[in-house]
């Protein structure tokens, strides 16, 4: 009997966590706020793209985007950068914590007058990294 109650309580907790997460997302959309936190990857780019496109459909009022990221996948950051430039509403970007590497690409998508920084924000920009591997004959192709 105790095991059954415990399982039900765990299921209720998971259900409540999901409902709370949905409530928070709804509140963020109502206030036209997007948060980018952590590693930038394809999954994050898809999520942010959906949010920005949805906010554009909801109206032309400015969107506030908070960013705290040490970087990640360059092409994912390029996607977010391009969407910010593409949508009609003004996007105000606020840097907090670290804004580095691929995160800088996103931060720079806002017009200069729409970029803000909290007092303890640190920025880091570097040259793109890349390279080739393989047989010299294959690389020469």
Residue ranges and their predicted role:
Residues 1-141:
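Terminal-region recognition feature
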